[in-house]
């Protein structure tokens, strides 16, 4: 059984909200066991738990909300917390969005490893897929099946010469996340920028925090991986799937997915009951024990 965990010391980061364009101060604070992952809007004096029922929007990011108070773009930070097994932490922000940092999860990953991770002497159940589950909407398809571990197979297709069809299948553990997933940046297309801005998105987007593609390639930068695009989609998927609220056992096969299909799939998964909260050994490579 995995143990509940928190961070050993407080983390403070500052960055820009990719959609709001605002400067945001972010603090991660250790929390007692059984607290869960709790976002706290300091500017509104309001907490929101990182749980599936509180997802209120999935337009170009995953947004949590209660009573009209929202926190946008939670997926990269949640993915990092999930992979490193952090189950209890307060996340304080002074605005309505998690800072995008460089568009990836690498800054969050480095900060958490530097702060250290503490076991809290109490176990947490596993969310274990027990029967195959299939979901389809528009062009997106998601299939989950039982698996001894946590694995994601992702396939994307974009009519762009740098992307076209990309696919990757990867075990989700700390080492693979640090090396292969966390550094992958969010991406968008130059042709879509006017639409995004007109509709209140990407006000803080720049070449410093996103891969921007014109008709031929990346504008003003280079790829970290040849298949950085599908790797980033896996990062998003981990963050969205983490809203289940438990460590996950299962193999998730996703084709042309996005935040909306990820979240709708989770809702169907809960409805079908093809899972159990299990108490058994959890196989996940532990990098944090070596790094703290």
From Swiss-Prot:
Pathway linked to the protein: Glycolipid biosynthesis; lipid IV(A) biosynthesis; lipid IV(A) from (3R)-3-hydroxytetradecanoyl-[acyl-carrier-protein] and UDP-N-acetyl-alpha-D-glucosamine: step 2/6
Keywords: Hydrolase, Lipid A biosynthesis, Lipid biosynthesis, Lipid metabolism, Metal-binding, Zinc
Catalysed reaction equations from the record: a UDP-3-O-[(3R)-3-hydroxyacyl]-N-acetyl-alpha-D-glucosamine + H2O = a UDP-3-O-[(3R)-3-hydroxyacyl]-alpha-D-glucosamine + acetate
Domain of life from the UniProt record: Bacteria
Binding site for Zn(2+): 76, 232, 236
Top class in the EC scheme: hydrolase
Function: Catalyzes the hydrolysis of UDP-3-O-myristoyl-N-acetylglucosamine to form UDP-3-O-myristoylglucosamine and acetate, the committed step in lipid A biosynthesis.
Protein name: UDP-3-O-acyl-N-acetylglucosamine deacetylase
Species of the source: Thermodesulfovibrio yellowstonii (strain ATCC 51303 / DSM 11347 / YP87)
Gene of this entry: lpxC
């Amino acid at each position: 059984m995995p143990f509940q965990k928190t961070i050993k010391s407080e983390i403070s980061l500052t960055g820009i909200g990719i959609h709001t364009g605002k400067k945001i101060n972010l603090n991660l604070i250790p929390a007692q066991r059984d607290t869960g992952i709790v976002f706290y809007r300091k500017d509104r004096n309001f907490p929101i738990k990182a749980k599936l029922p509180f997802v209120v929007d999935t337009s170009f990011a995953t947004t949590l909300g209660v009573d009209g108070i929202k926190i946008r773009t939670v997926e990269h930070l949640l993915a990092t917390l999930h992979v490193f097994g952090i189950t209890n932490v307060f996340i304080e922000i002074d605005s309505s969005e998690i800072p995008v940092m460089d568009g990836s999860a690498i800054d969050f990953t480095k900060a958490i490893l530097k702060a250290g991770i503490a076991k809290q002497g109490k176990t947490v159940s596993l969310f274990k897929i027990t029967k195959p589950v299939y979901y389809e909407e528009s062009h997106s398809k998601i299939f989950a099946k039982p698996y001894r571990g946590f694995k994601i197979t992702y396939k994307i297709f974009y009519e762009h010469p740098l992307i076209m069809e990309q696919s990757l299948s990867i075990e989700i553990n700390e080492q693979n996340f640090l090396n292969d997933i966390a550094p992958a940046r969010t991406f968008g297309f130059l042709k879509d920028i006017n639409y995004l801005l007109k509709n209140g998105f990407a006000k803080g987007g720049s070449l410093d925090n996103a891969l921007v593609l014109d008709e031929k390639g990346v504008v003003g930068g280079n790829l970290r991986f040849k298949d950085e695009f599908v790797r980033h989609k896996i990062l998003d998927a981990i963050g969205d799937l983490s809203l289940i609220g438990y460590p996950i056992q299962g193999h998730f096969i996703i084709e042309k997915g996005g935040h909306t299909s990820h979240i709708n799939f989770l809702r169907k998964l809960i409805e079908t009951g093809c899972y159990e909260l299990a108490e058994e050994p959890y196989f996940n490579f532990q990098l944090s024990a070596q790094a703290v």
